[in-house]
UniProtKB/Swiss-Prot annotation:
Residues 116-126, 508-519, 1341-1355 have a biased composition (Low complexity). The gene is atg26. This is Sterol 3-beta-glucosyltransferase. It comes from Neosartorya fischeri (strain ATCC 1020 / DSM 3700 / CBS 544.65 / FGSC A1164 / JCM 1740 / NRRL 181 / WB 181) (Aspergillus fischerianus). Pfam families: EryCIII-like_C, Glyco_transf_28, GRAM, PH. It is an enzyme of class 2 (transferase). GO terms for biological process: autophagy; carbohydrate metabolic process; lipid glycosylation; protein transport; sterol biosynthetic process. Residues 249-288, 733-799 form the GRAM domain. The lineage of its organism: Eukaryota, Fungi, Dikarya, Ascomycota, Pezizomycotina.
Length: 1418
C-alpha cells in the first residue's frame, strides 16, 4: 500500500508544483505578468459595445443591464445592501495583503516544521526541493514566485498513529496497542450504563449471548502444531492459520452460504475433519448513503413528532429540515455509540407498528415511519450499522467443533432458499447452547443431508460428553473444544497463531476503534492484571459515583456481570481517566484492556471488599442459572480470592506516588464530575483556567488557530478559545464530537466568523482534512454545517454586508453560495489561503471510504487474506470444480440491488419523436446529435425548425419540418435588446406580432403525427401542442431554465453574487414576464386552431414537465433542489471533424507556430453586432501581438447585420493571425492552446471538452452564465470588457497559467468520458410514463375534442366546460414536495399505463384517426 500512496503523492506534487502561485484567488497575480501587459489608457474601453449610444465606448453600458433584472440590480446597487459589491472588492486585500498572506503561510509552514527534529526537517525539505521544484523548473523553464507549502498540503493525509511494537519481552504478549476513539468526556458525558438495556439489545440483534461468550482459548504451552506434511492441502493449511487449529485438518466439503443473524452475511462454509467453519469477507465503505428518506422524530422533551429528511451514511444517522440543503443538518445520531434499534409496540391490534427507537449510551431516540414496511427497513439498516460499528473489521470467522454439535434441523423461511439451524454446546462450564442459522440458495439439501449424517455419527459421543460431564474435569483437559468454539469478526491483520500462548490468541478483533464480537474471549494476562490493579486505584478515585450505579445495575441484570462487561461496547474505556496521561510503552501495553475492551470487573473488584463480591455472587446465585454464577466466579473471584495475583511483590514507587496524591485526585475528580454533569455547577465552580467573562470576551474578539500534526496549536497563533484546553481533551476530539466525524478527520484550523443566511449568525469555522464545518455560538441556536471540501468549487473574497467587515464567498457544486463575514481582513485572507491549499490537495485525491493509512493497510490485509483463501480453494479443487461466491450464492430477486432497475423502460414499439426548436445553428446542432441516437434506437425522429437548416438536417438522415421565422432577424433583436428581456418582448410584440402568430401556426402543423414531443422552451408552442395532441411532452435546453437556488436564471446573471433567494426569484419573475408578453396571442391561437380553452401559467404547471439539460454535470452540477424529473445528461456533441479536411494553409500555419514555440489561440465571437467592427479587429490584432501568441481568427462580427454607418475598409491581418471562415470545433479545438469566444452553450462545451483554457466575452443571453461558470471552475476567464489591456493579459494568462491548464485538462477528460446522448435517451425512457401521466391529467382538464372549429354546444355542456375550467383538476395542490408528487405519479402511471389508449379513444370525436391525425381545418 505504501508504494501506491507514494506514487499518488508524487503525482499530486507534480501537478501542484506546476501551479505555484498565490492561492487567495484563482487568477494570476499582476506581479506575475510581464511589464508589457500592464494596463494602458484603454483599460476601461469596451470595443465590443453595441451600437446605439455614445456612452457605450466608455464602458458604461453593461449587457446584463439590458434585462429587466439588470435594471433592478442597477437600482439596488445604490443601496447599502449592495455596497459590498463595489468594484473595489476585486482589489480589497489583494495588493496590500498579499505579502502578509505569503509570510503567514511561510510562517505557519516553518512553525509546523519546527515541531519535528531538525534532521527530519532537513530531509523533508531537501527531498521536496530536489524531487519537485528543481525538476519542474527545469522542465517548464519558469517558476512562479508564489509557492504552496507541500508540508501543509499533504500532512493531513498521512496517518498520525505511531505503531507500538507488538511483542513485549517481559510478557510475551503480541496484542497490538490500539487506542479506541473514545468520545470526549466534556462534550458528551457518559452516564452509567444500564445493563438490562444491553441485554435486551443483544436479544433484538439475534446475537445470542452464548454465541459471543467464549472461554479463553487454552492451548498446551508445550504443545506444538502438527507437522505440515506433503499431503496437507493448501486450503487446510490456510484454514489452520485463519482459525487457529492445532494441526491442518482435511477439508471434507465446502459450500457457499449465508449466515443469518440480524443481517445476512454471505460467505463460505468449510467442513473439516473436526470443525465446521464459516468465513465472510466484508469490505466497508463509509461514503455511500445506505438509506435515506422521510421520518418523524420525537423531541427530547417535546412529545410531538416532527418530520425530517434522514440520511444514514457511514456510522451517522443525520436528519435535515430540508432535503435540498444537506450541508446543514438539524442533528445527528452517532451510531458508534449505539446499543440497539428496535420496533415499537403496535398501538392498534391487527396493525403492525410504525414506530421504532434507537438507543445509544446517551439517550433513546424515537422515530415514526410512514408505513410499517418502511419502519422495518429502517430498523434493519440501523441494526446492520450498529452491528458493524460494534464489531469493526472486514471479515467474519466462526468455527465450532463437530463433537460440540447437538443437532441440526430445517428452519424454512423463504421458498427460494434452504435454511437450517445448528445447535452447539458452548463449553463445559456453562452448558450454554448456541444456535446458528445458515441459508443456502444453492445445494442446500445436499449440505443438510451431509451435515446431518456427520452429526448422527457422533450423537452418542456428544450426549455422553456434554450432558453428563465429570465434575472434576478441568478446562485444560479438552483444549480443542473451548478454543475452537468461538465467533470473531476480525480484520485481515489479526492472525491467530497456534503455537503461541493462550494470551496471544486474544488479539484485537478490529484494527480501528471498537471491540469485536471476539471481545468476550479477550481477558487479562497476568502482566496485564498487575498493571490494571494498580491503575484501578486511580480509576476508583474518579469513578466512585458511577461505580455505585453500575454495581446496582449489575445486580439487576439478567446475565452475569462478566458476560455483559466483556461484550459491552459501552465499557470500552473509563469515563474519567487518571491524571497521569503519558504512561510508558510497557504501561500502555499492560493496560490495553482498558482501551480495547470493556473495563473488566477486576478493576472494580480490587477496589471493593470481599464481602461485596460475595454478596454479589449470592444475589446472582439466587436470581440466575448456574451458568451465570460460574461465569461470575470465573471472572471475578479469581482476582479477589488470591490477592497476590493482583498485587504481586512490594508496591512500586509509581504506585506509592499515586496513592499519595489521592486527596488532589479525589478533588479533581469531583470537580470534573460536577463540571461535566451539571450546567449550574459549572457556572458556580471556579475550577476553570479563566473566568466566564474573560472566556466569552476572548471568543468574541475573534481570531484564528492553526493546528499541527498532533492537533496542537502552532506557537504563532493566539489563544482565543481557552475552552479547548480544558478537560485534558485533545483539540480535535471536541471538533469530531460536535460533528460526529471519524477519528481520521484531523483538525487543521479554526476561525471565528459570521455565517450569513437569513441573519448573520456568529460561530466558529473548522477546517479539517476533507471537511469545512461551522457551529453557531449564539445561545439558543443549534446551526451546524458540514461541507465536504470536494464539493467546493472556488473561494472568493468580497466586501462584507456590513461596514467594517470582510466577506468570503464559498462557491459550492450544485448549491447556493455561502457568505461568511470576518472582523479582520487578516483572518479572512488566512481562511481563504487555507481553503485554497486544501482544495488543491483534494483536487486530485479521489476520496474513497478508506481515508486513513491504517485503514487502508487493514483493508489490504483483509483483502489479501480473502484472496489467499480463494487461491487455496482453486489449488485444491481446480477452477472447474468450484464456482465463485458471486455466482454460486446469487441472491434471489427479493434482495434487489437498489442501483439496478427491475423494469425495462425502453418502449416495445418505435416512436415518432418530434424535436421543436428555434434560434441559431447552435440551437439546432444538439438536436441533430440526439436524433441520430434515436435513429440508432429504432425510432423515427423529426426536427422542426427554421427552413434554412433543412439541408443540414436531412444530410444526417433525419426528417425535417419547417417552422416560420428568420433566425437572422431574431439574432438582431437578441443582440440589440438582450435575449427575452423586456425590450426584446416589447419589440417582438410590436413589430413581430405576426411573426409570433406564424411561428405558433407553423409549429402546430409541423408537430402532427407525433408520439412524443421534445421542445426547447424558447419555441413557446410545445406545451400547448402536446396538450392538444395528448402526447407526452419533454423539454430540453442548453441553459438553466428550472427554478433553483443554486444558479440564477441564465438571462439574469448579476454583476456580483446575490445568494440563493435572488437566484430563485429570477426564475419566478422571468416566467411571469415571459408569459404575460405572449399570453394573449397564445390563448387566441389555442382557441382558434388547437380547440383548447384559454390557460394560465398556474394551469400549465411548466415546472412539472420532465426536463433534459444538454450540458455536462461537471460544468453545471445538478442542484440539490432539482426534482428527479429534471436531468442533466451531458453535452449532445455532433462529431463532424472526422469528415472534414482542413485547408492546407491552416495546417501550415499551425505547423509553423509549433516550430516557433508559440502558443496558438482561437478567437471567434460568432455573429454579433458591434458599433465599430474595424476597431474590434484592431484590438484583436494588438492584443495577439502583445501577448506573443499565434491566432486563428473567425471574424463573424463584420459578416452579418453590421451597422452600415460604421462600414470601413478591412484591416489587413499580420502574419501572426490566420483567418478562417468555418471549421468543426472538435477538430479545431484539439489543435490549439486556448479558445476565445462569446460563451454560447455549444461553443463552450466544445472548448471545455478539448481541455483547453477558455476566455469568454459574453454579449447577451446565456453567455454571461457560462462565462461565470468557466471562471468559477478555474478553467478560464470571463471578460466584462474587451480592450488591448484586458484582452492581452487574458491571452497570456490562459496560455501560461499551469494551474488553469491542468484544471482545463482534467475537466476535458471528464467531459469526454460522458455520453450525453445515451444518457438523454435513457432519461426519456425512464420518464416516459411520468410524461404520459401529465398528458392524461391535461387531457382530463381540457376535455375538448381535436377540432380547430368549436362545435355547437348546449347550455348544459357549456356550463360543464366552465366547471372543468374552474376546478383545475390537474393542478397540484397540497404540501407535497415535487419529489413526493413525482413518486406518486409514477406509481399511478405504472398501474394506469394500459388505460391511456382506451381513454384517448373514448375522448376523441367520431371519425378521429387518433392523436397523430392531421387536422382537416388546416
Amino acid at each position: 500500500m505504501r508504494p501506491f500512496l507514494d506514487d499518488a503523492k508524487r503525482r499530486v506534487d507534480r501537478k501542484l508544483s506546476a501551479s505555484r502561485q498565490s492561492l487567495s484567488t484563482s487568477r494570476l497575480l499582476p506581479s506575475a505578468l510581464p511589464d508589457r501587459l500592464k494596463d494602458n489608457h484603454d483599460a476601461q474601453v469596451d470595443f465590443t459595445a453595441p451600437p446605439g449610444g455614445s456612452g457605450s465606448r466608455e464602458g458604461h453600458l453593461q449587457y446584463m443591464q439590458q434585462s429587466i433584472f439588470g435594471m433592478i440590480a442597477a437600482v439596488g446597487s445604490r443601496s447599502d445592501f449592495h455596497a459590498r459589491f463595489d468594484e473595489s472588492s476585486d482589489s480589497d486585500g489583494e495588493s496590500e495583503q498579499r505579502p502578509r498572506k505569503e509570510s503567514s503561510v511561510r510562517k505557519g509552514t516553518s512553525a509546523s516544521a519546527n515541531t519535528s527534529s531538525p534532521l527530519d526537517s532537513s530531509q523533508r525539505s531537501s527531498s521536496r526541493t530536489d524531487g519537485k521544484s528543481e525538476k519542474e523548473s527545469g522542465t517548464r523553464g519558469r517558476r512562479h514566485p508564489r509557492t504552496i507549502s507541500d508540508h501543509k498540503l499533504f500532512r493531513p493525509f498521512e496517518s498520525n498513529s505511531k505503531h507500538e511494537p507488538q511483542t513485549d519481552p517481559s510478557t510475551g504478549d503480541e496484542m497490538p496497542n490500539i487506542s479506541p476513539p473514545t468520545r470526549p468526556r466534556s462534550a458528551t458525558p457518559r452516564a452509567a450504563p444500564i445493563l438490562s438495556r444491553m441485554v435486551e439489545a443483544q436479544a433484538q440483534f439475534d446475537l445470542k449471548a452464548s454465541s459471543t461468550e467464549r472461554s479463553q482459548p487454552s492451548l498446551d504451552e508445550s504443545g506444538e502444531k502438527g507437522p505440515r506434511g506433503a499431503s496437507v492441502s493448501p486450503l487446510s493449511t490456510r484454514l489452520m492459520d485463519m482459525f487457529g487449529f492445532d494441526k491442518p485438518e482435511k477439508v471434507l466439503v465446502e459450500y457457499a452460504c449465508s449466515l443469518l443473524q440480524s443481517i445476512l452475511l454471505q460467505g463460505y462454509m468449510y467442513v473439516t475433519e473436526g470443525h465446521i467453519c464459516f468465513y465472510a469477507y466484508l469490505p466497508k465503505k463509509s461514503t455511500v448513503a445506505i438509506k435515506s428518506g422521510y421520518l418523524y422524530k420525537r423531541g427530547r422533551k417535546n412529545p410531538k413528532y416532527s418530520r425530517y429528511w434522514f440520511s444514514l451514511k457511514g456510522d451517522v444517522l443525520s436528519y435535515y429540515a430540508d432535503p435540498s440543503n444537506l450541508y446543514f443538518p438539524s442533528g445527528h445520531v452517532d451510531l458508534r455509540y449505539g446499543i440497539s434499534a428496535s420496533l415499537g409496540e403496535a398501538k392498534e391490534k391487527g396493525r403492525e407498528p410504525r414506530d421504532f427507537q434507537v438507543t445509544t449510551d446517551q439517550r433513546t431516540y424515537y422515530f415514526r415511519a410512514d408505513s410499517s414496511m418502511s419502519a422495518k427497513e429502517w430498523v434493519k439498516a440501523l441494526q446492520k450499522v450498529i452491528f458493524r460499528t460494534h464489531n469493526e473489521g472486514e471479515s467474519v470467522k466462526i468455527s465450532f467443533p463437530i463433537e460440540s454439535i447437538i443437532d441440526i434441523e430445517e428452519s424454512p423461511m423463504v421458498d427460494f432458499a434452504e435454511t437450517f439451524k445448528i445447535r452447539v454446546i458452548e463449553d463445559d462450564d456453562s452448558y450454554a447452547i448456541d444456535e446458528y442459522f445458515f441459508t443456502f440458495f444453492n445445494s442446500g439439501r445436499e449440505a443438510f443431508e451431509f451435515l446431518r449424517s456427520l452429526i448422527n455419527d457422533q450423537s452418542l459421543k456428544i450426549s455422553s460428553q456434554h450432558l453428563s460431564p465429570q465434575p472434576d474435569r478441568s478446562p485444560r483437559s479438552d483444549p480443542t473444544r473451548k478454543s475452537r468454539n468461538r465467533w470473531s469478526l476480525t480484520s485481515g491483520t489479526s492472525r491467530v497463531l497456534g503455537n503461541s500462548r493462550a494470551e496471544t490468541q486474544r488479539k484485537a478483533s478490529a484494527s480501528t476503534s471498537h471491540t469485536s464480537l471476539a471481545h468476550d474471549v479477550i481477558k487479562s494476562s497476568p502482566a496485564t492484571r498487575h498493571q490494571d490493579s494498580s491503575e484501578s486505584i486511580l480509576n476508583s478515585f474518579e469513578q466512585g459515583t458511577e461505580s455505585s450505579a453500575a454495581w446496582q445495575s449489575m445486580t439487576d441484570a439478567a446475565e452475569s456481570a462478566s458476560q455483559i462487561l466483556n461484550r459491552s461496547d459501552v465499557f470500552q474505556s473509563p469515563t474519567i481517566h487518571g491524571l497521569d496521561r503519558r504512561p510508558s510503552g510497557g504501561e500502555r501495553r499492560g493496560r490495553r484492556n482498558s482501551d480495547e475492551t470493556a473495563r473488566s470487573l477486576s478493576t472494580r473488584a480490587n477496589v471493593g471488599t470481599g464481602q461485596q463480591i460475595d454478596e454479589l455472587g449470592r444475589r446472582m446465585d439466587g436470581d440466575t442459572s448456574g451458568r451465570e454464577a460460574r461465569d461470575s466466579t470465573g471472572e471475578s473471584d479469581q482476582y479477589t480470592q488470591d490477592p497476590t495475583k493482583s498485587f504481586s511483590g512490594a508496591p512500586s514507587l509509581n504506585e506509592l506516588v499515586k496513592a499519595g496524591v489521592y486527596p488532589l485526585q479525589r478533588a479533581a475528580g469531583l470537580a470534573e464530575y460536577l463540571r461535566t454533569r451539571s450546567k449550574q455547577m459549572s457556572n458556580l465552580l471556579a475550577s476553570e483556567s479563566m473566568g466566564y467573562i474573560e472566556k466569552v470576551s476572548g471568543m468574541w474578539t475573534g481570531g484564528r488557530k492553526h493546528y499541527g500534526e498532533a492537533e496542537d496549536v502552532l506557537p504563532d497563533d493566539q489563544d482565543v478559545d481557552p475552552e479547548d484546553k480544558e478537560d485534558g481533551c485533545n483539540y480535535g476530539d471536541r471538533f469530531r464530537a460536535h460533528f460526529a466525524l471519524p477519528r481520521t478527520e484531523k483538525l487543521q484550523a479554526t476561525y471565528f466568523a459570521y455565517l450569513h443566511r437569513v441573519l448573520p449568525l456568529y460561530g466558529k469555522i473548522y477546517v479539517s482534512q476533507k471537511k469545512l464545518c461551522f457551529r453557531s455560538l449564539i445561545p439558543g441556536t443549534r446551526t451546524k454545517m458540514i461541507l465536504p471540501l470536494r464539493d467546493i468549487e472556488n473561494v472568493e473574497k468580497e466586501k462584507g454586508f456590513r461596514f467594517g467587515y470582510h466577506g468570503l464567498v464559498i462557491i459550492i457544486r450544485g448549491h447556493e453560495e455561502l457568505f461568511f463575514e470576518f472582523r479582520t481582513s487578516d483572518a479572512r485572507d488566512d481562511c481563504a489561503v487555507t481553503l485554497h491549499q486544501h482544495l488543491e490537495a483534494v483536487k486530485f485525491m479521489a476520496e474513497s471510504g478508506l481515508l486513513a493509512e491504517q485503514e487502508q493497510n487493514d483493508s489490504e490485509a483483509a483483502m489479501t487474506e480473502h484472496r489467499m483463501l480463494q487461491e487455496a480453494r482453486y489449488d485444491d479443487y481446480g477452477e472447474n470444480d468450484l464456482r465463485p461466491l458471486n455466482e454460486s450464492s446469487e441472491l434471489h430477486p427479493i434482495f434487489d440491488d437498489p442501483r439496478a432497475s427491475i423494469v425495462n423502460f425502453k418502449p416495445a414499439e418505435s416512436l415518432r419523436i418530434t424535436c421543436l426548436t428555434i434560434g441559431s445553428r447552435g440551437d439546432v446542432q444538439p438536436y441533430i446529435a440526439l436524433c441520430k441516437g434515436l435513429l440508432a434506437e429504432g425510432h423515427r425522429p423529426k426536427i422542426a425548425t427554421h427552413a434554412e437548416f433543412e439541408p443540414w438536417v436531412r444530410k444526417h438522415g433525419i426528417d425535417f419540418a419547417p417552422v416560420e421565422g428568420d433566425p437572422a432577424e431574431l439574432m438582431r433583436i437578441c443582440v440589440e435588446n438582450g435575449m427575452f428581456t423586456y425590450s426584446f418582448l416589447k419589440e417582438a410584440s410590436q413589430k413581430f406580432r405576426g411573426w409570433i402568430d406564424d411561428l405558433l401556426s407553423s409549429a402546430w402543423a409541423s408537430c402532427q403525427d407525433s408520439d412524443l414531443l421534445i421542445e426547447s422552451p424558447s419555441a413557446m408552442a410545445g406545451i400547448h401542442i402536446a396538450e392538444a395532441l395528448r402526447i407526452p411532452y419533454f423539454r430540453a435546453f442548453t441553459m438553466p431554465w428550472s427554478r433553483t437556488r443554486a444558479y440564477p436564471h441564465a438571462f439574469a446573471v448579476p454583476e456580483h453574487r446575490m445568494g440563493g433567494a435572488y437566484n430563485y426569484i429570477t426564475y419566478v419573475m422571468f416566467d411571469n414576464v415571459f408569459w404575460k408578453a405572449i399570453a394573449g396571442q397564445v390563448n387566441r391561437w389555442r382557441k382558434n386552431e388547437l380547440g383548447l380553452k384559454a390557460t394560465t401559467l398556474d394551469k400549465m404547471q411548466p415546472n412539472k414537465v420532465p426536463f433534459l439539460y444538454n450540458y455536462s454535470p461537471s460544468v453545471v452540477p445538478p442542484p440539490l433542489d432539482y426534482p428527479d424529473w429534471i436531468r442533466i445528461t451531458g453535452y449532445w456533441f455532433l462529431n463532424e471533424g472526422s469528415d472534414w479536411t482542413p485547408p492546407t494553409a491552416l495546417c501550415e500555419f499551425i505547423h509553423r507556430a509549433r516550430e516557433d514555440g508559440k502558443k496558438i489561440v482561437y478567437i471567434g465571437f460568432g455573429s454579433i453586432v458591434v458599433s465599430d467592427p474595424s476597431a474590434l479587429t484592431k484590438t484583436v490584432i494588438e492584443s495577439v501581438r502583445k501577448a506573443d501568441v499565434r491566432c486563428i481568427l473567425s471574424k463573424g462580427w463584420s459578416d452579418r447585420l453590421g451597422d452600415p454607418a460604421s462600414a470601413k475598409p478591412e484591416v489587413p491581418l499580420p502574419p501572426e493571425i490566420h483567418q478562417i471562415q468555418a471549421a468543426p470545433h472538435d477538430w479545431l479545438f484539439s489543435h490549439i492552446d486556448a479558445a476565445v469566444h462569446h460563451g454560447g452553450a455549444g461553443t463552450t462545451g466544445a472548448s471545455l471538452r478539448a481541455g483547453v483554457p477558455t476566455i469568454i466575452k459574453p454579449f447577451f443571453g446565456d453567455q454571461f452564465f457560462f462565462g461565470s461558470r468557466v471562471e468559477d471552475l478555474g478553467v478560464g476567464i470571463c471578460m466584462k470588457k474587451l480592450n488591448v489591456s484586458v484582452f492581452s493579459r487574458a491571452l497570456w494568462e490562459a496560455t501560461h497559467s499551469e494551474r488553469m491548464i491542468i484544471r482545463a485538462q482534467d475537466l476535458g477528460a471528464r467531459i469526454r468520458s460522458e455520453d450525453g446522448v445515451a444518457t438523454a435517451i435513457q432519461a426519456i425512457y425512464r420518464d416516459l410514463e411520468y410524461a404520459k401521466t401529465l398528458a392524461r391529467q391535461r387531457s382530463i382538464a381540457s376535455s375538448t375534442p381535436f377540432s380547430p372549429t368549436p362545435s355547437a354546444k348546449t347550455t348544459a355542456e357549456q356550463d360543464a366546460d366552465d366547471d372543468v375550467e374552474d376546478s383545475e383538476e390537474w393542478t397540484f395542490v397540497g404540501d407535497d414536495t415535487d419529489m413526493e408528487m413525482s413518486r406518486r405519479l409514477r406509481d399511478r402511471a405504472i398501474s394506469d399505463a394500459d388505460m391511456l389508449p382506451d381513454r384517448l379513444l373514448a375522448n376523441s370525436v367520431p371519425g378521429d384517426s387518433g392523436p397523430g391525425r392531421k387536422l382537416s381545418g388546416r
